[in-house]
Amino acid sequence: MTRKTLAIEGLTATTVIDGQQRVLVDNLSLGVQRGRILALVGASGSGKSMTCSAALGVLPPGVTASRGRVTIDGVPYAANALRGRHVATIMQNPRGAFNPVRTMRDHAIETLQALGKLSSNPQDQIVHCMRAAGLEDVKTILSLHPFEMSGGMLQRMMIALALLSEAPFLFADEPTTDLDLVVQLRVLELLEKLVEERDLGILLVTHDMGVVARLAHDVAVLDHGRLIEQAPVMDIFQTPGHEVTRMLVSAHLSLYGMELNA
């Protein structure tokens, strides 16, 4: 069976620093399949988060996506048609993503409104997605403000809001950053479960090679905005082909007193 594929093709993003053009994402192409997790890794500043932002048309001021397109099964989509409808997103700092004066119910309703999916009785849909994200005491949680919730609860709520879109693809930008190890594991297990049960295709942005080893099927490695290597996760860890990839894997293994085989 052929899986639906989201393809980023020839994506380039640039900015101007001190009068000189600087390329942040350099002619990048990669594909995300439904039912699989592609980890996008690289050193800080390598262009991981910028790739997601450029693909979805949410670049910061002063940055321009000068070329490239995103297709699903070969059909091109404008960025504003992708966001929320075909690609949901979760960010690395959930506390900063929520309006501090609004409850979780407010955020859920506003999400449905933005998606054009608000029905006369949205409660069942909201409850279903929250439970799918591992949130059980739904009535209480919907009444809470962000400052009343832990980082793990907020990350699960962000996943629940993403599920409201029913999008087939998810861009997850450092979803376990700033979470303790136990909560990290629970979030990773949740994402894995959603891939299996909902056939989600996930583009996982992370600097943590432990997360990559635990969750990813395939890995794409960036360096200075360029895709330098892409391979199944086992190949990346056992036989990395590029020196930058070798450095990333070696640094990860050294945390456990291990070395990469020559």
Swiss-Prot record:
It is a peripheral membrane protein. Pfam families: ABC_tran. Keywords: ATP-binding, Cell inner membrane, Cell membrane, Ion transport, Membrane, Nickel, Nickel transport, Nucleotide-binding, Translocase, Transport. Its main location: membrane. It catalyses: Ni(2+)(out) + ATP + H2O = Ni(2+)(in) + ADP + phosphate + H(+). The keyword Cell inner membrane applies. It is found in: Cell inner membrane. ATP binds at G42, A43, S44, G45, S46, G47, K48, S49. SMART domains: AAA. Its EC number is 7.2.2.11. Residues 6-249 form the ABC transporter domain. GO terms for cellular component: plasma membrane. NCBIfam families: nickel_nikD (TIGR02770). The complex is composed of two ATP-binding proteins (NikD and NikE), two transmembrane proteins (NikB and NikC) and a solute-binding protein (NikA). Part of the ABC transporter complex NikABCDE involved in nickel import. Responsible for energy coupling to the transport system. Belongs to the ABC transporter superfamily. Nickel importer (TC 3.A.1.5.3) family. This is Nickel import ATP-binding protein NikD. It comes from Brucella suis biovar 1 (strain 1330). The lineage of its organism: Bacteria, Pseudomonadati, Pseudomonadota, Alphaproteobacteria, Hyphomicrobiales. The gene is nikD.
